[in-house]
């Protein structure tokens, strides 16, 4: 199972092919919804273009998708049904986040000297995701 990675630059080029995406659910993959006012969690339709784009990335095997949401864990069943109904492919999901700013903190060092995290903000309920991430699948 030994793989010769070649030079350090070869290694950098190899690992740059792989990404982990933390993707908010409501307003990004499905139309925005809430717990207390309609439309309620699990009831909204998907944002087709964003779903299709992420599914294509997921199918490459080089993009790991973690869905993030402020939905409570108590909404897990209806959320998972909605994800299945809309055909959303993902690897993991995180519930119970604050409905507030989210920041990713990551390290970098000699084995990965390039920036190791980015942030993308899109307008709620739009199909802009591919425009911001278009180079990921290449």
Residue ranges of model-derived segments:
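Conserved alpha/beta core of the MobA/IspD/sugar-nucleotide pyrophosphorylase nucleotidyltransferase superfamily
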Residues: 1-18
């Amino acid at each position: 199972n030994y793989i010769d990675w070649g030079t350090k630059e070869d290694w950098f080029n190899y690992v740059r092919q792989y990404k982990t995406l933390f993707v908010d659910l409501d307003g990004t993959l499905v139309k925005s919804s809430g717990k207390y006012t309609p439309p309620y969690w699990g009831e909204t339709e998907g944002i087709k273009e964003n779903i299709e784009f992420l599914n294509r990335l997921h199918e490459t095997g080089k993009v790991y998708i973690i869905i993030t949401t402020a939905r409570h864990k108590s909404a897990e069943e209806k959320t998972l049904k909605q994800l299945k109904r809309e055909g959303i492919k993902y690897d993991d999901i995180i519930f119970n986040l604050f409905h507030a700013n989210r920041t990713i903190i990551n390290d970098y060092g000699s084995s990965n000297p390039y920036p190791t995290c980015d942030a993308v903000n899109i307008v709620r309920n739009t199909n802009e995701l591919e425009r911001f991430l278009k180079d990921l699948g290449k």
